[in-house]
Regions:
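C-terminal glycine/acidic-rich active-site capping loop/insertion
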Residues: 33, 47-92, 114, 119-195
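C-terminal capping/lid region of NAD(P)-dependent oxidoreductase domains
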Residues: 212-223
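Predominantly a Rossmann-like dinucleotide-binding segment in NAD(P)-dependent oxidoreductases
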Residues: 1-77, 132, 218
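Beta-strand scaffold of nucleotide-dependent catalytic cores
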Residues: 97-100, 124-125
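Glycine-rich phosphate/pyrophosphate-binding beta-alpha loops
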Residues: 25, 99-108
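Glycine/proline-rich active-site loop of Rossmann-fold NAD(P)-dependent oxidoreductases
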Residues: 37-38, 78-80, 94, 107-111
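A general structural signal for well-ordered alpha-helical segments in protein cores
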Residues: 27-28, 177-181, 208
Length: 223
């Protein structure tokens, strides 16, 4: 709604990008983490759906859906994106595309990732975090339930409970800090840490900046 409002809508506080910088940065990082590929070039198109939003003149809880009276709002022009489409080129020559939206009704925090190979497609939906959809060319498609006994060791290391015991969003932070604390206990950082570092944070900032450059110039931009 045009009454949805928080500090991220104000560029002087949050910067010149919103949907990409706020939630797209996480998706772009996940893509590189899972695939092992690096994004080398981007082409972006931004869209601001609500060009004017109503800023509450009194406190209102984020995500609450509560409405104030008309006189309790001030009209504010919006200069950051509600929605973005980004084409990606990877360092191995493959392509990808990303859609990020903060104006999709009913989608509070969904992350969907789909990777298509030469023979199979794998899809993950964060709203069903214990399932992976596997698309096949010459047999029935499959839904794989999370089960440490069926996973590679690298994946099993990120699972705490046995199959049939759900794990979800809150467990991701737990798994992250297990790796961080293990490095602290060892007294040194691994040569190739699985957890994000300052270098990863810098890279995501750089990618977001290049995406901004692309939407402004309407051209492909190298990372």
């Amino acid at each position: 709604y045009n009454t949805d409002y928080n500090w991220r809508l104000e560029p002087d506080k949050s910067g010149d990008s919103r949907a990409i910088a706020d939630i797209g940065s996480h998706l772009l990082d996940v893509i590189e983490y899972i695939t092992g590929l690096k994004t080398v070039e981007v082409m972006a198109d931004f869209n601001t759906v609500h060009k004017v939003r109503k800023k509450p003149l009194k406190p209102v809880e984020t995500y609450s859906g509560k409405m104030l009276q008309p006189e309790d709002y001030a009209d504010v022009p919006i200069n950051t994106e509600d929605h973005a489409n980004v084409l990606l080129r990877f360092d191995n020559g493959n392509r990808g595309c990303v859609t990020v939206s903060q104006v999709s009704a009913g989608r509070k925090n969904q992350l969907k990732l789909e990777i298509s190979g030469s023979n199979k497609t794998f899809a993950f939906n964060s709203e069903s975090p214990n399932e992976m959809w596997i698309g096949n060319r010459d047999q029935a498609n499959q839904v794989l339930m999370r089960d440490p006994s069926l996973a590679y060791p690298e994946a099993t290391a990120l699972m705490t409970f046995p199959g049939g015991h759900n794990e979800g969003f809150s467990d991701t932070s737990k798994q992250l800090f297990k790796e961080v604390y293990a490095a602290v206990e060892a007294g040194k950082q691994p040569e190739n840490p699985k957890y994000p570092t300052f270098a990863d944070g810098y890279r995501e900032l750089l990618i977001c900046e290049r995406i901004l450059d692309s939407t402004r110039s309407q051209k492909w931009v190298k990372i």
